[in-house]
Each structure stands twice: as C-alpha cells, then as structure tokens.
C-alpha cells in the first residue's frame, strides 16, 4: 500500500515541476510616471517601472527589453518602434525614456520583458499606454476662455457691504445661480479616440449628453491662479456618439481667488 502511494505521488510532483519550468517568471504591475495608463503626463521623457513575478524563490532580474510605439498593432509586431532598448541591468524602477521625441497630446504604447542570469527572457508583458499632456501655452492654441455674462454692478452682492436691515418679505435680487455652459458638437466620421482637456478658475463639472464625465470632484486642483492654472483630462472615446453630442460645463458659484489660505 505504501509503494502504491509513492508511485501515485511521484507523477504528481513531476507534473508540478514541469509546470514551473514552462513559465518561470513574468512581468506585471507596469507603471508610467507612477500611474497605470495615464491620460496626461507632464514630461516628454517619462519614467517606466514594473515588477517581476516568479514561481521560484530568489529570482533576480538580470536584464530587460522595453519598447515604445505610437500604435499598439505595430508594437505587437515589433515594427515602427520609437524606442527599443535592450540592456543588462537589474533596474526596474525609473527607467527613463530615451527614444524619438514625443509629442504633446499624443498617446503611446509600451511593453517590457525581463531576462534572468542565463539570458532566458520572460514573455512580453501586456501592452500598456500613456499620453503626453499639454505642456505649454502653445499646445492650447485654438482654445479660449469662456465666461458667464458680465454681472451688472446693481446686482452685485459685495461681502461686508450688505448689512442692511431686512424685514420678512423683503427680497434681494442677485445673479447667484451656478454658471452653466452648453455646446453642441456633431460627429460625422468614425472616432478612434477622443480626449477632453478642461481648465477653470475654480471648480467645474463636465457633462456629455446629460451624463457627468468621470467620477472626480472639485476639479481642477487648486493653485495660485496668478501663476498657474491646472487642468483635467478625460477620455470620452466611449461616451462620444455618432451624430449630435451636447457638452455641458457647470462652474462653482463662488468667485475664484488667487490666494489660497
């Protein structure tokens, strides 16, 4: 009986060992500028990072190969690469891009594989993406600020100046509703990718065809508006529909301030 158990156990162990040898290590947790598939990075030379998963103990990365392309199909075939670096190194953090010049507002795709000390390579990682943001004022050419109608002085409520005695039934008329903007856009051709960049002096919410875009709150981040204005990026490729589309923006009711306390 003991011999039969040993004979049954041996093929089981052998099959487990054979499975380990077939797929020993792979790459996971790919990040570009510390983010997964970022929509807008603020540099033309991004940094890449990844982790290596191994079924065996003590695995050490001895080298890597990283590739970047502007089209995922070209990247999968290893064609029209913007960057293809193969190096003997155990570094897997902050690998700086050193390929052809990237362009603001464009999306790119990348993948990586690693090797062990014997020169054996892992399978290629999943293809990930990143997009370069709008880095300077010239990238905003064609965009313009939009604003609510000018508020007449007779309807302006000035803090500290409105302490008049008010009795029940008296009213004060003012334009205190939330400023809202609406714009219709017609899509007449197939759209592969659509990105919206929105900036505002204060907070805003963006709507497309009646639905709020994204799950963010209090966009954009606060800053000193005399020096810098932040913006938010949204991928609306799936929300944009053929034919007519309606964009809406609702701003916060309070006036923006250039000094943050």
For each of these PLM feature ranges, what is it?
Residues 17-21:
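Sec/Tat signal peptide C-region and signal peptidase I cleavage site
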Residues 133-171, 249-258:
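An acidic-aromatic loop/edge-strand motif
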Residues 8-16:
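Bacterial N-terminal signal peptides
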Residues 1-6:
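Positively charged n-region of N-terminal signal peptides that target proteins for export
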